[in-house]
Amino acid sequence: MWIGIISLFPEMFKAITEFGVTGRAVKQNLLQVSCWNPRDFTHDKHKTVDDRPYGGGPGMLMMVQPLRDAIHAAKAEAGDGVKVIYLSPQGRKLDQTGVTELAANEKLILVCGRYEGIDERLIQTEIDEEWSIGDYVLTGGELPAMTLIDAVARFVPGVLGKQASAEEDSFAEGLLDCPHYTRPEVLDGYVVPPVLMSGNHEEIRKWRLKQSLERTWLRRPELLEKLALTDEQKKLLKDIIEAYHIRQSKTSDNG
């Protein structure tokens, strides 16, 4: 997978290219990350990259010419078939479904805004899609871009030890992840669930599925509304809800 970055702070992306799973993917040429800094496309001695917005108001916008030239340079290197993404609070909110869609692209250019954003005409003419990582404002698009890269890179063949790791992760099936345990068997009086040490793979699978369903129902119930549950999942969820109400009833009686 090839990813081009448009950023005033390309050094920030060393966190992606030099460390962890993504850093290893870059070293193995499974993931290619190239950066373009709009400052390198300025024509004045001060390397100016911001400009005043029409209509006044606080803050500045990224200057059109250096940003557009940087995008064009990235597009020229990428060639045909590249999708240009602008990281923006106004964009579609990134979730696992979106990650899967973006991971299907062989080439992406990620435009990281700064200041108060970029000229709307650039969004209309240069940007294919806008994406957001949440309903809050950051100082720039670099951290959202790194989040997106980390998420989509997991679906590139060979990046993870097992492709199943990406497919079984939290949200991969629309559910929250189940609890995980490692040694020691007993930690401060808390014991690893016996089923996980039973060696019975089918029972372990069912336990994990039930835990995922219960966590999702308790913490993010809106996610379940989007899913077409299997018969097995429906039955497990019914059991979970019934058991929960029984516990609540006993608690009320004791109170």
From Swiss-Prot:
EC number: 2.1.1.228
Record-listed S-adenosyl-L-methionine binding positions: G113, I133, G134, D135, Y136, V137, L138
Gene3D superfamilies xref list: 3.40.1280.10, tRNA(m1g37)methyltransferase, domain 2
Cytoplasm listed as a keyword: yes
Localization per Swiss-Prot or TrEMBL: Cytoplasm
Reactions catalysed, as given in the entry: guanosine(37) in tRNA + S-adenosyl-L-methionine = N(1)-methylguanosine(37) in tRNA + S-adenosyl-L-homocysteine + H(+)
CDD domains for this protein: TrmD-like
Keywords tagged on the record: Cytoplasm, Methyltransferase, S-adenosyl-L-methionine, Transferase, tRNA processing
GO molecular function: tRNA (guanine(37)-N1)-methyltransferase activity
GO BP field: tRNA N1-guanine methylation
Main location: cytoplasm
GO CC entries: cytosol
Pfam family, one: tRNA_m1G_MT
Biological role stated in the UniProt entry: Specifically methylates guanosine-37 in various tRNAs.
Record family assignment: Belongs to the RNA methyltransferase TrmD family.
Subunit structure: Homodimer.
Protein name: tRNA (guanine-N(1)-)-methyltransferase
Encoding gene per record: trmD
